[in-house]
Amino acid sequence: MTRMKHILPVLAILAALVSCHERPAVLRDTIPYVKQLAVDTTGTFQLVSTYRTTGTKGSIAVIGEPEVAVQLAAVLRQADQVDNIDGLPKPDRLPDFAGESFDILLDEYNAPYLRMAASSPDSLTEVAVRNAVIAVDSVAYSNALDPRSRLAKNRAKVFVLANSLLAEYGQFDIDTLFKMAGREAVILTPVEAMLEEAAKSGYKSVAVWAPAEARSAYENAAKALQPQLDVTVVSTMGNGLLRPAFRDMLRIYRTLKPGSNLDAVLLDSFTANLEELSAEKEHIHRQITEEDMAFDRILMPHFRFIEPNAAMTGALYRLLREKNLFTHDIAYPTVRYYQTEENRDGEYVPVEVSAAYLSAHQKSEPYVPDID
């Protein structure tokens, strides 16, 4: 009987790997942490096993580094781009996510993710899984070191991973863990959201301006989900000014794809200044220099920038409608903020944070996007 208890989780792992049909990328193994959870069917695995995605109750968990997660939360809370009755793209003076509860998990403890992805990708994957697990817990704390400071918390019905690196280092393993427990994890990433936006716009050729560490996330997702798109990932140094950096990106694209045109550039940044980028695009269009003329030939007349705030807002709305997860309550969205911390046992727990903490991580008013 003991031997069977250890064999069954292994079989569950294999079944989960095969059943991840939504992203038919290269079959790969999950990290040791997830396998460990599968063998120990108490505690964390039991928590995941009791998770339910049916019905409309539960929160939308936004998981990521503090500055980005705070900004995305503000964008989602303020969004009014569609008619809540028929879903058509027209404002109706009612928040798109009316009645929804957002739980924002601010992972300052493990930020920046880019450094972790470069030095220890498996560690970043484990971080993503741990954060997903605490998102489905019904308990939070006011003090991570005091187990008596328990607070009630919503269990997540949707996971919004607010970083492209979490799409590469985490999404697969979160999905695998939940499938091993016989559950479905509803996950949204900026990678899939922006590629979906490009595809539904009818675009054929796009560049993704992203760090080298995020390259495989976009390439794998494009092959699996949007194979009709010609996707080229371009990385620049990222230490200079934005407008010259955009020109550097175009120079690299010309080298990688000589003679090709661009329908759009997908921005792997929640905080990029779209006004500056649009101004540089218009400057190029005036064709003052030979390089301007060369760049202008690359950019299609309908060229635009696709950024994750707008793409994820639209994708989240469509996802909730598709899976019938809207609460349908007539009320303003509620937002609660939690910081990821370790307790005395080294476990991740969500700690509710104050408005003072939030203002320290929101450096400017968030850009509120329009959705085509």
Write out the residue ranges for each language-model feature.
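Sec-dependent signal peptide recognition
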Residues: M4-A12
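Generic detection of intrinsically disordered/low-complexity segments and helix-coil linkers/edges
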Residues: L11-L14, A331
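C-terminal motif of bacterial Sec signal peptides marking the signal peptidase cleavage site
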Residues: L17-S19
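Non-catalytic structural scaffold of enzyme domains
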Residues: H21-D372
